[in-house]
Amino acid sequence: MDFERIAERIVDFIREQVEAANAEGVVLGLSGGIDSAVVAFLCVRALGREKVLATIMPEKGVTAEEDVADAIEIAKMLGIEYRVIEISDIVKMLTEKLGKANKSAEINLKPRVRMMINYYYANGLNRLVAGTGNKSEISIGYFTKYGDGGVDFQPIGDLYKTEIFQFAKFLGVPEKIIRKKPTAGLFVGQTDEGEIGMSYAELDEILKMIEKGIKRDDEKFRRVLKLVNGSEHKRRLPPIPKVRDLI
């Protein structure tokens, strides 16, 4: 991997997105994990620290204190403005108002609350929301529709998770963040690889095979292929029926 050229291309892309929208910078959710750290580093490189706002949005009793501390450390390291917004009261207010739902609906409400907060600041500051999704997550739909998937652009969306680990080292992301077990932080004890049912190394190997049109006859391959096909709707704009020929 030519890390310098990859960084340059992504940096140019970020600048182009912001300029095309006549925006004045970006807002991004900083979780204390590797993906958001990498995006923060790239946004600062592209726009300068004064044009990057980080939102740190923990949930009481769920988000690890270490993750909040690491997110703040990254923000201070880069010299960017950050806001810590604890989301528990917002989530509680919504669930009480809306009534009891199933576990999936309640869990997915959290990233949707975070999305609303990001756009609240982005709208107020004339900025875009930078996403932090990687190619592995996007490919299998491992994100919440109109939650963490609700962004204006995805700077690292063409890099697999295993490539992000290498890229982060090149950018200078602290080693302790690179070594962390990846987690969406939606419930206590949650890990990405535990939910996906395989390591990112295994997942990325299969995704690269699918991308090249190579097939494999085993349970993990079939599971990943099912996830890719079943999440296609998450990667597209809402479908529209064609009626112009009837008018």
Predicted regions and their residues:
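ATP/NTP-dependent adenylation/nucleotidyl-transfer catalytic domains that generate, transfer
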Residues: 1-26, 42-45, 50-53, 60-109, ...
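Conserved G/P- and acidic residue-centered "switch" motifs that form tight phosphate/ATP-binding loops
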Residues: 33
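Catalytic nucleophile loop
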Residues: 36
